[in-house]
């Protein structure tokens, strides 16, 4: 596996699809969105998409809320988009045959607003994930402005199997790992807006935590894990980047720079998914029905008595 860095609602039941063998060329678009400037951010997305297509990427992933920036507060309604909006259609068209993940504020039914990310390939949107866990503690206040998503759901992607998306805080909750394992994901994509916290010498605590989570998820799921964070400043806070790819055995494959915008290309061998699952068949041995029964018992004890 190699990397190149260039500066710069009812769920449907789908048949399981095994990823094809061979390489998946991923582009990690570690950008610095401008807060509230949707047009400028759209242009930056189009620039990165053009480069990624020229470099032969199969998939490009942008950070959480990549079209808007993070600390939106009262301008959330002003920057929100419907998933059928012309701006999103423009991105999907520009990506062409390349798969695309980007973050946006989605306006849903009843004028509710969601921190969301969409996945598109071959000219159409296949999936939109709405962030389930909205941090509202410390410097975070998402529950004041966003509605929470209600599910974690995987989907079938052409050529590389089952894909799941989580957004930032979702990655910190064990329920997302449990559900994604039950969904038999092959590739887990986590889009992030994480500022640098817990700085001690050259190390950034949040960066170390995301790497630890990615390595843990990859081994539990036997999956390829992509984490894409942003860079830049908002409200005096620094977003550290350090986007990364971890293989299904928990090995760090590639990592983008800290603090700088970059477009990092990573060639991932999908055959490693099969090899790792033969060596460590955690998914095969998982007791899903027992887990469901135990959770139902806990639900009755905690919420129905």
Cite the ranges covered by each PLM segment.
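Fold-independent oxyanion-binding glycine-rich loops
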Residues: 31, 65, 103-105, 122, ...
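CN hydrolase (nitrilase-like) catalytic-core segments centered on the catalytic cysteine
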Residues: 83-102, 168, 172-263
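Active-site catalytic loop in hydrolytic enzyme cores
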Residues: 83-86, 108-212, 278-282
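Short beta-strand scaffold segments in enzyme catalytic cores
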Residues: 102-104, 115-119, 153, 243-245, ...
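Cys-nucleophile CN-hydrolase/nitrilase-fold catalytic domain and related Cys-dependent amidase chemistry
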Residues: 2, 38, 47-132, 194-223
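C-terminal beta-strand edge segments of enzyme domains
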Residues: 2-14, 216-305
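N-terminal active-site segment of His-dependent metallophosphoesterases
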Residues: 2-59, 189
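A structure-centric signal for secondary-structure junctions around beta-strands
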Residues: 21-23, 114, 240, 260
